[in-house]
Regions:
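Short catalytic/signature loops enriched in Gly
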Residues: 66-163, 170
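P-loop NTP-binding/switch modules centered on Walker-like glycine-rich loops
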Residues: 1, 5-9, 13-95
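Intrinsically disordered and other compositionally biased segments
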Residues: 15, 21, 44, 154, ...
Length: 170
């Protein structure tokens, strides 16, 4: 296969079994020359195994880019909110942070950007129009805050060839 899809392959596993599963996935991908599409909520696993990461909210891709760029310099307000939820070992807090509001119920998606009811930066356009992905630095972001970027076709993701060409050119 050209891609191995692993949906939450390390959820609820202890650290040693998790490491074995990740090593197995890496070995299979290397041996067969395939990519791995990892579906997970575990940011530690993403940081360890992935080259690129896509962040989804309510079934829509809101940001995609190199792991380091997305994890350390998130552009989309949802991605930035997620990164802000990761507890710091160097800082003691009495209450863990959270993203305000609630996820919409399946089938009851709001109009426009699905994150707008929870977004601290939402404007009127966000309630009406679904944002098209735009190129921002090395990432693609579906957010009206970045509408001055280079537009891409809505839902269009970079191909494997485009990614390797862009990375080779850098």
């Amino acid at each position: 296969p050209e891609v191995i899809i692993a949906d939450e392959p390390t959820t609820a596993l202890d650290v040693s079994i998790q490491a074995q599963i990740l090593a197995l996935l890496r070995g299979l991908a290397r041996q067969r020359g395939t990519a791995i599409m990892l579906v997970t909520h575990d940011m530690g696993v993403i940081a360890e195994i992935a080259d690129r990461v896509g962040v989804m909210y309510a079934g829509r891709l809101v940001e995609i880019g190199p792991v380091a760029a997305v994890l350390h310099s998130a552009h989309h307000p949802y991605t930035a909110g997620l990164m802000g939820l990761i507890p710091s070992l160097s800082r003691r807090v009495e209450r863990l942070p959270q993203i305000s509001g609630n996820m919409p119920r399946p089938g009851e998606w709001p109009g426009g950007c699905s994150f707008h009811p929870r977004c601290p930066k939402a404007g009127p356009r966000c309630t009406i129009e679904v944002p098209a992905p735009v190129a921002v630095s090395d990432s693609m972001v579906a957010c009206h805050l970045f509408s001055g970027g280079t537009s891409v076709v809505s839902g269009d993701l970079p191909t494997k060839e485009a990614i390797s060409t862009r990375e080779t050119a850098s």
